[in-house]
A protein has these predicted regions:
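Terminal leader/tail segments of proteins
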Residues: 1-142
Length: 142
């Protein structure tokens, strides 16, 4: 899989946190955690990586989608099925993340643009930007 070269002006940091994170879609609770890892990457919204144990496994289905990132590694995706409707690629994860973000191994990241994210009891706006308005049209590397 081809991945674009690193940009010397992009920085990626991963920090453990105790913030309370809830992930919902269409009123359904998908995940809830008090031990996320926050990933900050230049030009992108903060990503909340949640321990796999904190994501409801009964809603997840493996996806064939894979993407690459020159800063984090190669991502695999999981779709979410709610009331018979399949939502593609709502979570991604790195089986072998690069050294800079090695602590996200065993964690899943919700696609902020396509879910409802509540952090410390406060609903977060769905970001617009490089991944599309409100994240609905199309997908790009995680």
């Amino acid at each position: 899989m081809f991945v674009h070269p690193r940009d010397p002006f992009v920085r990626v940091n991963a920090l453990k946190s105790s913030r309370h994170v809830r992930v919902e879609r269409d009123g359904h609770l998908l995940a809830e955690s008090d031990s996320p890892i926050l990933v900050f990457e230049t030009g992108l919204p903060t990503r909340y990586y949640l321990p796999e144990r904190d994501v409801d496994p009964s809603l997840l289905v493996d996806s064939d989608l894979q993407t690459g990132c020159p800063y984090k590694g190669f991502a695999s995706y999981r779709d979410v099925v709610l009331s018979g409707r399949r939502y593609p690629g709502l979570f991604w994860y790195y089986q072998a993340p690069f050294r800079e973000v090695s602590q996200v191994k065993g964690y899943l990241a919700p696609y902020n643009e396509r879910i409802d994210l509540i952090v410390d009891g406060r609903p977060q706006d769905r970001p617009a930007g490089p991944l599309g308005p409100r994240g609905e049209p199309g997908m790009r590397a995680a």
